[in-house]
Amino acid sequence: MAISLKVLAPNKNVYQGEAEEVILPSTTGQLGILPGHISLVTAIDIGVLRLRMNSQWKSIALMGGFAEIESDEVIVLVNNAEIGSEINVQNAEQDLKEAKLAISKFSENEKNPEKIKALKQVSKAEARIQAAKN
């Protein structure tokens, strides 16, 4: 038995297919989904969705959103997403370096909108790197 998985961003259908297992980065921690999972709606954090099919794992970098799990169907609606195998690691590592440099310009306890934006960019770059390397 398999799970039907759809990952949708505003501008594209990122992934549509079946999976034997799905691991989502929810805002409360990693959420593992197998066939027969209880119905659920959850917020998705910036992180990596992992799916297993035929003993092979695929990774998708997610940039926050929501997921609905119901009757062996998982629908993930996100702000943006990239399939790991399509991510340019060098670009993601450069983005990470630039975001960390931007953060270093602020004091540790400073609450500045630009610092918050840079912290989010760090999370996004790290998710992209992790998805690309898995």
Swiss-Prot record:
A GO molecular-function annotation: proton-transporting ATP synthase activity, rotational mechanism
Subcellular compartments: Cellular thylakoid membrane
Keyword field: ATP synthesis, CF(1), Hydrogen ion transport, Ion transport, Membrane, Thylakoid, Transport
Superkingdom of the source species: Bacteria
Annotated Pfam families: ATP-synt_DE_N
Bilayer topology: Peripheral membrane protein
InterPro entries: ATP_synth_F1_dsu/esu (IPR001469), ATP_synth_F1_dsu/esu_N (IPR020546), ATPsynth_dsu/esu_N (IPR036771)
Gene Ontology cellular component annotations, sorted alphabetically: plasma membrane-derived thylakoid membrane; proton-transporting ATP synthase complex
UniProt family annotation: Belongs to the ATPase epsilon chain family.
Purpose: Produces ATP from ADP in the presence of a proton gradient across the membrane.
Quaternary organization: F-type ATPases have 2 components, CF(1) - the catalytic core - and CF(0) - the membrane proton channel. CF(1) has five subunits: alpha(3), beta(3), gamma(1), delta(1), epsilon(1). CF(0) has three main subunits: a, b and c.
Designated name of the protein: ATP synthase epsilon chain
